[in-house]
Amino acid sequence: MLFRSAPNGTGTIKVGGNYAASLVAGEIAHSKGYAAVLYLDPKEKKYLDECGPANFFGIRGNSYITPQSHSILPSITNKSLQQLAEDMGLTVERRPVPFEEIATFDEAAECGTAAVIAPISQIDDLDENKSFVIAKDGKPGPVCEKLYHKLRAIQYGDEPDTYGWISIIE
């Protein structure tokens, strides 16, 4: 089991060492055909942390669930998605998320600046030889789809920015 950050380390700060620590796990994952690595917390090794260089969130019923951790970089994209989720009527839960909870998600995704939302269709636990299929058809779920389109519409100016997120530079 490999970890991206150390307990009480620099995981919450954008520094090169945080990315370097993930290179080995990323190489192993890519050599086995995986797109990304889902990291657990470095202290108790049982709570979801983040997905490669991006934040993780899951949708279950009417809840947007994202890890609260002292070892991950806070994401502006995740924060924006949480606001949009609340505005859509979802309950936002920011808390420690046990790994086993993956089996209960209707949708899951990683989120960050580059992709905004990258849906996750399956998570494989190679240590325990378990697979969790989240998107049976491999497509984004309806909540991820709505969140993605809403945020992109605000970013591109197709919808008004009522949050003060966009600055016009002349």
What does each model-found stretch correspond to?
Residues 1-170:
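Helix-start/capping segments and mature chain N-termini
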